[in-house]
Curated annotation (Swiss-Prot):
<feature type="zinc finger region" description="C2H2-type 1">
    <location>
        <begin position="249"/>
        <end position="271"/>
    </location>
</feature>
<comment type="function">
    <text>May be involved in transcriptional regulation.</text>
</comment>
<comment type="similarity">
    <text>Belongs to the krueppel C2H2-type zinc-finger protein family.</text>
</comment>
<dbReference type="GO" id="GO:0008270">
    <property type="term" value="F:zinc ion binding"/>
</dbReference>
<feature type="zinc finger region" description="C2H2-type 4">
    <location>
        <begin position="333"/>
        <end position="355"/>
    </location>
</feature>
<keyword id="KW-0238">DNA-binding</keyword>
<feature type="domain" description="SCAN box">
    <location>
        <begin position="48"/>
        <end position="130"/>
    </location>
</feature>
<dbReference type="GO" id="GO:0006357">
    <property type="term" value="P:regulation of transcription by RNA polymerase II"/>
</dbReference>
<dbReference type="InterPro" id="IPR038269">
    <property type="entry name" value="SCAN_sf"/>
</dbReference>
<keyword id="KW-0805">Transcription regulation</keyword>
<keyword id="KW-0862">Zinc</keyword>
<keyword id="KW-0479">Metal-binding</keyword>
<keyword id="KW-0804">Transcription</keyword>
<protein>
    <recommendedName>
        <fullName>Zinc finger and SCAN domain-containing protein 23</fullName>
    </recommendedName>
</protein>
<dbReference type="Pfam" id="PF00096">
    <property type="entry name" value="zf-C2H2"/>
</dbReference>
<keyword id="KW-0539">Nucleus</keyword>
<dbReference type="GO" id="GO:0000978">
    <property type="term" value="F:RNA polymerase II cis-regulatory region sequence-specific DNA binding"/>
</dbReference>
């Protein structure tokens, strides 16, 4: 399942982060006032690791060791910038992450939460996806898409958030879909499907990296040797086991079941329309806290997810996931009328209007209809603008 792959992806990225931390420490080891930007979650994680991993043997004596620890703690907690409450929040957050199971800790750290509340929301989202993959994510996607449409200027890039799958390709520098493609189910990423893989040799480096992902619970299919075939029965059995989690909380409206009552309560808001989480900046409301957190990045401009190929950054990992298809050339969405393929499902839906004749965009001045919104914008220029009196 997609969420299983993402959990194990988090562990892999945690290991990659450790390597990156070491590289950046070596690069900026000239002193405490390094070239690192100290105002982002990734840098705070680097300083935290420096503080926690400092060894007594690295200093010539006890006084120097204590002084170095004080410097490292200062770099991490930044008392000249943070209030006592903020410092306490960082310490509680660190301890909260420490007590989590290893695989969950890696998953949460991947999202770089800045508070305990945000870390809890990440975990609740994970539980929700295990309960009902896709539904809540698509709900967030719809809310974000509507907001972006309202606020975006003409020509602004749109970030799709209809998928929570984070690819490893930008970390490994390797087209994993060519080695072991992802099975798409109803337009959503599913499990690695080795049966779709070409019969060619896979490098030992890539093979070992992918196999690391499967060591937690084995839900990722074993990477085959050259010419091997997938054990279909074994894969189906693993899928049956993963779907056998008890879900005692049942929605009286639609019959869907959930593992926790809190997730059922949030689900019921899709029926009632309740949106208790409101943005302080623009007043927009959301049914879930995670939707509000994602939305707030539009105001702050925070973009945590960066493409290692071209450097472009995104506020959500789904935006990076779709962007990577530009580099890989992947076009998984195919028109059943003309067989033309597209990298995004939304583009396929717009393309299909050519075949169906649907023209949803109407000019209020003359009543002419258009397939694409951009065509309507262009058409409006033919109408004279009424001068204000």
């Amino acid at each position: 399942m997609a969420i299983t792959l993402t959990l194990q992806t988090a562990e892999m990225q945690e290991g990659l982060l450790a390597v990156k931390v070491k590289e950046e420490e070596e690069e900026h080891s000239c002193g405490p006032e390094s070239g690192l930007s100290r105002n982002n979650p990734h840098t705070r994680e680097i300083f935290r690791r420096r503080f926690r991993q400092f060894c007594y043997q690295e200093s010539p004596g006890p006084r120097e060791a204590l002084q170095r620890l004080q410097e490292l703690c200062h770099q991490w907690l930044r008392p000249e910038m943070h209030t006592k409450e903020q410092i306490l929040e960082l310490l509680v957050l660190e301890q909260f992450l420490t007590i989590l199971p290893e695989e969950l800790q890696a998953w949460v750290r991947q999202h770089r939460p800045v508070s305990g509340e945000e870390a809890v929301t990440v975990l609740e989202d994970l539980e929700r996806e295990l309960d009902d993959p896709g539904e809540q994510v698509l709900s967030h996607a719809h809310e974000q898409e509507e907001f972006v449409k309202e606020k975006a200027t003409p020509g602004a890039a749109q970030e799709s958030s209809n998928d929570q799958f984070q690819t490893l390709e930008e970390q490994l520098g390797y087209n994993l879909r060519e080695v072991c493609p992802v099975q798409e189910i109803d337009g959503k990423a599913g499990t690695w499907n080795v049966e779709l893989a070409p019969k060619r040799e896979i490098s030992q480096e890539v093979k070992s990296l992918i196999q690391v992902l499967g060591k937690q619970n084995g839900n990722i299919t074993q990477i085959p040797e050259y010419g091997d075939t997938c054990d279909r029965e074994g894969r189906l059995e693993k899928q049956r086991v993963s779907s056998s989690v008890e879900r005692p909380y049942i929605c009286s409206e639609c019959g869907k079941s959930f593992t926790q009552n809190s997730i059922l309560i949030e689900h019921q808001r899709t029926h009632t329309g309740e949106k208790p989480y409101e943005c302080d900046e623009c007043g927009r409301a959301f049914s879930q806290r995670s939707g509000l957190f994602q939305h707030q990045r539009l105001h702050t401009g925070e973009k945590r997810y960066q493409c290692s190929v071209c450097g472009k950054a995104f506020s959500q990992n789904a935006g990076l996931f779709h962007h990577l298809r530009i580099h890989t050339g992947e076009k998984p969405y195919q028109c059943n009328q003309c067989n033309k393929s597209f990298s995004r499902r939304s583009v396929l839906i717009k393309h299909q209007r050519i075949h169906t004749g649907e023209r949803p965009y109407e000019c209020e001045e003359c009543g002419k209809n258009f397939i694409y919104h951009c065509n309507l914008i262009q058409h409006r220029k033919v109408h004279p603008v009424a001068e204000s009196s």
